[in-house]
Amino acid sequence: METLAKRLDACQEQLLELYEEDSKHLEKHVQHWKCLRIEAALLFKAREMGYAQVGHQIVPALEISRAKAHVAIEIQLALETLLQSTFGTEPWTLQETSYEMWHAEPKKCLKKQGRTVEVVFDGNPENAMHYTAWTFIYVQTLDGTWCKVYGHVCYAGLYYIVDNMKQFYCNFKNEAKKYGVTGQWEVHDGTQVIVSPASISSTTTTEAEVSSSGLTELVQTTDLYNTTPTPTTITRSNCDPDGTDGILYKDPTPTTPPRKRYRQSLQPPTKHLQHYGVTNVPVDPGSQRVTSDNNNNQRRNPCGNQTTPVIHLQGDPNCLKCLRWRLKKNCSHLFTQVSSTWHLTEKDYTRDSKDGIITIHYYNEEQRDKFLSTVKLPPGIKSCIGYMSMLQFM
């Protein structure tokens, strides 16, 4: 009993010294787990001999000591092989080699530089869960060698790549079954938001072909009229175990406001926006898009070759400002220029209404038609088509 107590005291004293040292050398952490293994073995032996207490130490049950010893042996052996690899000279903290880190997803791997990824289910910010994505993951292959890989985030989940194979350690589809109802979710990774292209195209988005690359770009309509500066730059997240790509939005970088301002000649203000020399084209209130007239004269340029097709959009100034921002970021290939927000005034220079107006210019009618068939305008935005001249003054 006395010998057992002395050995246990010496082991625990060494553990305290290691904790106080807080070393970043992997050799010290190997020694730490070796001490934990010896401590568990001594307590197991004491319990096996019938002791309930050794000194001031309460002796746990046999199964508890056995389980702790198995964990200590496993991690000690892993750290010893890591120490012999090229990553053994890297700085390692006690936390990075802890039991909690070893058994955190992905399990039985070493991880560094974790960050929080928020997943919002069913579009409800109140129904969100947090997950840990790792910047670096140290994986031991089947032949016992260690490799250092990057952790990745996509719409499907969290994963890393080893031997050209994606290994998912968190599947958001399974999480959506537990926490969601509709089976839809959004992934918020810092300033990036990844959403499902299937959910976008079936609800509030349309597809726009990118002529330069032949790729397809999805534009989320809700972002087109959201009054807060939400992420707008779109790229594809081509990683999904179920074959569903995600759409990645990044926060836009601040851009300088347009310097050139100009006035446009319009008829006196009425309830509906009118164009110089052009009759109004009705707007379908259900789709919020300009409807084409069957009369070919409406599609003919009435002012000669020095005019350009335009669309006037009228609505809340703040909504128009955000719409213009998102059009320039996401659909700049579908028009040539877009004006700043302007207003109609009465003869006494008072505003006719609080609504603002922006004007979008196009190379030709074909480009304008493509814009109309691609971009869905926000609710509350009135639109009508027409032609304008004197572009040389812009």
Curated annotation (Swiss-Prot):
Residues 307-394 are annotated as: DNA-binding domain. Gene3D superfamilies: 3.30.70.330, E2 (early) protein, N terminal domain, subdomain 1 (1.10.287.30), Papillomavirus E2 early protein domain (2.170.200.10). Phosphorylated. Residues 226-309 are annotated as: Disordered. One of its GO terms (molecular function) is DNA binding. It holds the Pfam family PPV_E2_N. Keywords: Activator, DNA replication, DNA-binding, Early protein, Host nucleus, Phosphoprotein, Repressor, Transcription, Transcription regulation. It comes from the Viruses. Its main location: host cell. Binds DNA as homodimer. Interacts with protein E1; this interaction greatly increases E1 DNA-binding activity. Interacts with protein L1; this interaction enhances E2-dependent replication and transcription activation. Interacts with protein L2; this interaction inhibits E2 transcriptional activity but not DNA replication function E2. Interacts with protein E7; this interaction inhibits E7 oncogenic activity. Interacts with host TAF1; this interaction modulates E2-dependent transcriptional regulation. Interacts with host BRD4; this interaction mediates E2 transcriptional activation function. This is Regulatory protein E2. It comes from Human papillomavirus type 32.
